[in-house]
């Protein structure tokens, strides 16, 4: 039986003051230091019901953040979905037509298919092509510990370690349903100097989720060289728990219309024995492939073609 969504403890900020931006793209603002350096992007609202990113960008604007070197861009991505957010029905505004974070490959962006999210992704693409370092702020359905999704490239793992939070780093290849923004172009290319991180800050509407998003953003900006050295050193010296790394080996993609887990998994459960049944996909048993298998982000959106859960193991 479906459970009621958690209480909404966060207030969706008014982002209308940022609509004009200064890039020619609505809701996208860039600050150029006039000095050589990297182009750093902090992205929020890939999904319209993930409030922590909007709260974080609103706070950065209010604090008058400016880069010491290079360029800093703050982007509210799926504004059309965000406008539909209703605390009385908080799960309904993830997207308008389709998932904004499954569109980021050349074939999809260059294709003929149309949707509200594709139109926005295509509008943002020229700017994203100029970005060197990306932090994409997200949150999760479940009340699960925060995760830093670093992809497979060593450069992004190194960046995640420099940021220092959250405690769990996940190395994964993404989803069969489509490419994420953090996997686009040079971000996922080991030969490119570009790097990207996607942080899942906690459950969508819990207060600590917004706090973690803000802390991660400040530490990312410090690690990226956006802040003055003394300020960056102060931020990065703040206590953080030792990080652990989960390497994802399998993504369970739903093949049929009747998929259900055997338990109410929330994420980061460690299943001791290989061969343990964790779900049924229209009668097909889904089993853990090895001992001490870690479940990453089990989904409540159990739809054909979508990722039900990722399976991994702790490597560090």
Outline where the language-model segments fall.
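Structured catalytic-domain cores with a bias toward divalent-metal coordination
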Residues: 1-316
